Amino acid sequence: TVTGVQTCALPIFSLMLYYLSPFGLSKRTQVGMQAPAGMVASQALETPEGEVRIALNGVESGSAASSSTSVQHVAFQTDDIFETAAVLSAGAFAALPVPEAYYSDLAQRHDMDEALLAALKATNILYDRDGNGGEFFQLYCLPLSSGLFFEIVQRKGGYSGYGAANSPVRRSALAQLPPHRPTPLDPKKAEIHV
């Protein structure tokens, strides 16, 4: 069951000041990641209790550097990502296919239960764990033609990050999509109940 909107990612440069004061948000650590379009900066803003989280993203250099103000992605929070994945896959949701090598690498990086690893792989769910044992699960849809994509997330054990370790995997999976890919929602099955 989806319990709410977890994160909304927006362009970084034009919106940071807008969100800081009026909404009582504070900056978290800024992360920089290399991408084919240039260096991507991601600045997380949160309320003190973490009930509102906004990730501002921007390409700092390269041909894709832009001051666009459109929403780039929306993440929805769930209490059970595997149940939500099953409901979505039975409906119109098309998950972003995760490369097979990701799960082999994941098994090497974390001491993981084989059943959990198999469940992640079967549902194209990404995983991260912090130094305190907090866990983060991510499920992405295929992007819309505008570039907007949706994500389902589940946090366990106080994980407070955004899964930055999985960002290169998501970008790699996107790069492997065929030019004429399916849409994230099949119009014949466009009604989803979660």
Model-flagged regions — what are they?
Residues 1-8:
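Single conserved hydrophobic/aromatic residue that forms the stacking wall/gate
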Residues 81-84:
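Extended, hydrophobic alpha-helical segments in both membrane/secreted and soluble proteins
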Residues 11-27:
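Amphipathic alpha-helical segments
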Residues 10, 74, 147:
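Terminal peptide-recognition signature
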Residues 70-78:
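Acyl-donor binding region in acyl/amide transferases
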Residues 28-30, 60-65:
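ER-lumen resident redox/N-glycosylation machinery signature
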Residues 9, 35, 56-60:
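Contiguous mid-protein beta-loop-alpha structural module that forms a pocket-lining wall or clamp
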Residues 5, 29-54, 86, 91-194:
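Vicinal oxygen chelate
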